[in-house]
Each structure stands twice: as C-alpha cells, then as structure tokens.
Amino acid sequence: MLAVMRFLFGTDGSPGAQIALDFLCAMPLSNADHVSVVTVPVYSFIGTGVVPEGPDLLRDRGLDAARAIGESARAALATNGVPVSLDVRNGPVVEALEMVSIQDAADVVVVGSRGLGVFTGVILGSVARALARHASMSVLVVRERRTAPQRLLLAIDGSQEAWAAVKLVSQMPLPSAAQITVLELPASPNACHWPVMDEVRVLLSAHAIEARTAEDGHLAEAILAEARAVGADLVVLGSRGMTAGSGVLQGSLADQVLSQAHCAVLVAKPPMKPRLVTDGPAIARIAIAL
C-alpha cells in the first residue's frame, strides 16, 4: 500500500529556498500526497517615505511579495500533479511554520539550509536550525543538491528516535533505485532497544540496503565520515530535541550533523501527542489554499 505523505515547504524566495523547492519537485510525489507552501511577509520601510500611507504601503508590499513567492512555488509543485495549497502567515517564522504543520498534519517540513531573507544564518539558516532543534515535527534541510536523493545514509541505534527515522524513510517518496546505507550506532545503556535491523529490512525492503557499524567515539564525526564515504545525498537520523532523547540520537548530535553535513539532512521526530491548536494574535492567518 502506497504511503501518503504531507509536506510543508517554507520559502522566502531566497536561493537556498529555491534549491529546496527543486529538491522537493524532483521527488516522485503522487496525487495522493500534499504540499503546503508557507510564506511569512517581511516588512521593510525602505521607499515608503514619511507619509500617512506608509504603514499600509509597508503591509501591502510585504503581503504582495510573500504571495508572489508562495504562488511561484505552488505553481512549480503543481506541475507534477501533486495537490498544493498556499498559506501566507504573519508572525515569527518558526512559530508560523510549526503552527501550519500541526494544523495540516504535515509529516515533514522542508526548508533550505540558508538564504538571503528570513532564513539567513552564518553557516546554517537560523530558521532551519531552530526547527531542527526545537520543533515537534520532522525537518528536511536541503543543501546544494536539486534532484531526488539516490543514496541515503540512515543512522540508527535502539531508541524511539531511531524507530521514527526508519518509519519516516519507509514512507518517503524515494526513487525506486535509491540505495540505503544503514549505520548502526553504539546504543545508549538507557535506550529502549528493539530488533533494529530486522525492522529495517522489513520496512525498507523496496530498496537495496547495506548495513555498517560505527565504532565507539565521536558519533557525529562517524556519521559525517560515513556520509562522505558512501557519497550520500541525504542523511537521516532521529532526534527528540536539544534536551531529551532515549538513545544516543539526542538533539546535540543531530545539531552537529545538520551543521556540518555536505548534503541534505532529514531530522526525524517521534510522533507527538494530540494537541488542540488555535491561531494566536502573533500568528494571524492571512490566506490559505489560494
């Protein structure tokens, strides 16, 4: 049975966001999948002048620019036949993306690694980093590659976070020829162990799988080195956040890999408990499903 995936694509129209858009467009999405495109207006006083209409001009320009960016992404994704909706939100970017992801039941949030607008950062964009560290949903951070991943590195231990990563990969729309290298990490003594490789072979049976084992030591360096060795174009690992985790796949490790990887990184989060979501004043809904 074909898994149905719901993606949320956060864009600011920057070069980094365009790379992420090309990556998402290249994936073999079906008409059963869904993508929510989310943009957040960025307001600038440049050119408004000191006139009574200044605030209105500022708001209108920001909204128009955000809609144009979002509509361009929506049109690009729609050419592949996948259902796409557009949502323009006000407020802090990370909060807006997480709010929409919860409301739309998104499986994965897709962003560029860095950009020229609200995603700008020194090495890794501030929004991408904050989502991977603190958000409750899984996050795919795309770097230079603009085509669908063909060689995945899946880092696992015996934890719930690793299980979330394996399950997410099994549901992802990947090319049929994609190969998966599974890197077993030394399990934490406190991990809730499960027969990891048996489950991997069952859930990922549609793809060629190669199993490798990491030695004790600096695990982030081991993951990064293995990713380079196998020519990975996507690294997948689980994480519960910066302050929690039942195994070695804790937030600090995911953060190191995300910051230093040469390729795209998918940080999988365990499913969260159901929660009631309402729009707050800081994240007012402007438009949806245009």
Locate each region found by the language model.
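Short, structured interface segments
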Residues: 125-145, 263-268
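Aromatic/hydrophobic pocket-lining residues that form π-stacking "cages" and hydrophobic walls in ligand
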Residues: 24, 73, 97, 131, ...
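N-terminal membrane-insertion helices
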Residues: 66-70, 74, 193, 197
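Small/aliphatic-rich secondary-structure junction motif
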Residues: 2-54, 80, 147-213, 232-234, ...
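Structural alpha-helical scaffold elements that stabilize or flank donor/cofactor-binding regions
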Residues: 100-102, 131, 145, 228, ...
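Helix-enriched interaction subdomains in cytosolic or periplasmic regions
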Residues: 2-3, 9, 103-136
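Structural beta-alpha unit
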Residues: 1-3, 26, 56-60, 64, ...
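Glycine-rich, Arg-bearing micro-motifs that act as flexible, cationic patches
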Residues: 111-130, 149, 237-260, 270-276, ...
